[in-house]
Amino acid sequence: MFLRLFKYLWPERYLPEIPAQDPFDENPPPCGPGRVGVLLVNLGTPDEPTRGAIRRYLGEFLSDPRVIEIPRYLWMPILHGLVLAMRPKKLAPRYAGIWMEEGSPLLVYSQRQAAGVRQGLAARGVHAEVELAMRYGKPSIPAAITALRERGCDHILAVPLYPQYAASTTATVVDAVTRHAGRLRDQPALRFVKRFHNDPAYVEAQAGRIAEFWQAHGRPQKLVMSFHGLPRYSIELGDPYYRDCLDTARLLRERLGLREDEVEVTFQSRFGSARWLEPYTEPTLAELARQGVTEVDVVCPGFVADCLETLEEISQECRDAFVAAGGRQFRYIPALNDCPPWIEGLTDLVERQLRGWPTGNP
């Protein structure tokens, strides 16, 4: 407070440097409509597969009240006293096992998606700047918005890369984007993509990914569609995530021409002791094996880029559970990643959402 008062008493000394274009110029250059920016946002990842980097990432992720919806005074001692003290040690070798030469798979594939959308929009004559951000970790949302603003973007479309809406994923991206944009003196116009769980471009790309895999490797007895889990209380409080997942599963099943008994919908990545969405993926796979199912394929339609939850939890842990229970053939169908149909579909989605904004010649 004293420092602020001090600055008001001697304002000239503390004024920021006046920009080259005088804001009080009586004859300013004509002001155009500005440029359009696209902000693709995924969850985030540690910078490297080390305990320290994982601890920093988890600390930011699990401190978000949208993610852990219990009182702060109860959760923060648990987070700092137990979770951050123990979890990084367990996760470090798991991250190391999936790490790519270029870095974290989630970051690498997300960067390729951003590059693909940038090129795709340009090829269609849509002039838009494209940036990638992570909700937790780097590149951060504030840094990405700053980069777009520095390139003259006064319209920003934020695209959370979560097909199914959840408060703990999509809504927290909206929170972060609006929080940072709200601090700007010259605020950009904002739009958000809420969900795309039933978008034809997404469904077609995901179904095509499965069909292409089967064309190369043959079809199994069962297809398991595993979505990230949520605590049941999230749904009871009004979160539409569960319904979105079922809609996606139905659309994919119909597009692939499968009967209901050929598909299982499950939920993975349970955290803590609360009851989460069921059935759980790993026990379901073990039970299928005990029932005599020897061949399963698992796809994760909620993940548009491969990450720890798909490459380690599904492809390794769930495989082990299925085989240990008597299963013979377990195959994980990779996420959409940077496959051309998905890049094309994501570009379609972005282009549609930009309608009405100045995307012509800059």
UniProtKB/Swiss-Prot annotation:
Cited Pfam families: Ferrochelatase
Write out the residues that bind Fe cation: 228, 309
Q: Does the keyword Lyase apply?
A: yes
Q: Which reaction does it catalyse?
A: heme b + 2 H(+) = protoporphyrin IX + Fe(2+)
Alphabetic keyword roster: Cytoplasm, Heme biosynthesis, Iron, Lyase, Metal-binding, Porphyrin biosynthesis
The entry's cellular-component GO terms read: cytoplasm
Q: Which gene encodes it?
A: hemH
| Cellular localisation | Cytoplasm
Similarity comment: family membership: Belongs to the ferrochelatase family.
> Which GO molecular function annotations are given, in alphabetical order?
ferrochelatase activity; metal ion binding
Q: Any idea what this protein is called?
A: Ferrochelatase
Q: Which InterPro entries match?
A: Ferrochelatase, Ferrochelatase_AS, Ferrochelatase_C, Ferrochelatase_N
